[in-house]
Amino acid sequence: MTSVLIVDGANVVGSRPDGWWKDRAGAARRLHERLLVADTSYDEIVLVLEGAARGGVKAGRDGHVLTVHAPRDGDATIVERAKEAANRESEVTVVTADRFLRSRVEGVGARTMGPGWLLDQLG
């Protein structure tokens, strides 16, 4: 069974008051760079970006990280990706602090973790 980590980029970046709002694209790029070198047990990491953050990282695969540009809101894309992965019988973990989104992805079979957990994993 493969394991997939889906990252709510906006939520993770927004969890730390480090000035991300001044450069959303740069903040997304920094998160992507950290995910690329992360030593995790996940077979695939899906980074979902929306709005201005999409300008920081090209959509597509880079090693074990797949960056997805949400065409609308990131939440709908995250739920869609979680459902697709669960349907492939993957073990799915979604990183977000958004309670409503957590409920939605748990409804399609994913487990959830908060941004603090991921940031601790990234060191």
Question: PLM features: what roles do these ranges have?
Answer:
Residues 2-6, 10-123:
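Nuclease catalytic cores that cleave nucleic-acid phosphodiester bonds
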